[in-house]
Amino acid sequence: MPATLSHEVSGPRSDDTPVLVLLGSLGSDRSMWDAQARDLSRDHTVVAVDHRGHGTSEVVPGPCTIADLAADVLALLDSIDVDRFHVAGLSLGGAVAQWLAVHEPTRVLSTALLCTAAKFGEPSGWADRATAVREGGTAAVADAVVARWITAARAEAEPELVAGLREMVLGTPAEGYASCCDALAGWDNRAELGRISCPTLVLAGDEDPSTPPEALREIADGVPGADFVVVSPAAHVPTVEIPDRITDALRRHLDAARNTGAA
């Protein structure tokens, strides 16, 4: 049974307006896309989504898979009468976006994969993190997580930004966070990359310690015709760190996708 997802729909709704779905990182809520949603909703129907167990979405106890998270998104889109859509996903959201592009090619018009991976390290690391959070809450990992989200220079210059991001992680229910760690532990899409047939943008942050540029290069090399971009200076969540540049990159990608016939 899919989880009920909190979400926000912005922008015009019409048969001619393209739909853009935004999927965020582990430990985030949909506000990590606020800057992009404000701009892109001028000419897209933007659906910004909180994964299960994130933001105010339903918490489903126990482990889940990336396929489960994708099923949640599809159920949400069905409930609001969205058939075909563009999708942008960052980190965990990028894994979900990959799954959607592989398994729902008739629905996914294009995909933007930001600071993500076809495989996120070894399962044991995610199992350890899930255990730490189930035992100590997201406070057990919040500082380490936020240190990876933005560059050290930006963190030093804007302590209020660090504080806000830390509150975002702390606001994530422990079971929701841990369950999505379980999903990442089981994720390995490397053999499926060649099945992604829609226009694809692959974007890396030059200082991202979680999914460094080589992880994104692996995706770009595996997806036929993918565009590969490295942005600088940026760590793991460039939607917040350099929002205007990410918005511009997404707009160029969406415009190019439309020009190839992806409505």
Descriptions of predicted regions:
Residues 226-263:
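Catalytic active-site module of serine/aspartate enzymes centered on a nucleophile-bearing elbow/loop
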Residues 196, 202-204:
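Short beta-strand/loop motif that positions the catalytic acidic residue
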Residues 98-103, 107-142:
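Flexible "cap/lid" loop of the alpha/beta hydrolase fold
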Residues 206-211:
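Acidic catalytic loop of the alpha/beta-hydrolase fold
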Residues 68-85:
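Conserved acidic catalytic loop of the alpha/beta-hydrolase fold
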Residues 6-59:
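Conserved HGGG/HGGXW glycine-rich cap/lid loop of the alpha/beta-hydrolase fold
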Residues 89, 93, 97:
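Gly/Ala-rich beta-loop-alpha elbow adjacent to hydrolase catalytic centers
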Residues 121-124, 136-194:
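Conserved alpha/beta-hydrolase catalytic His-Asp/Glu region
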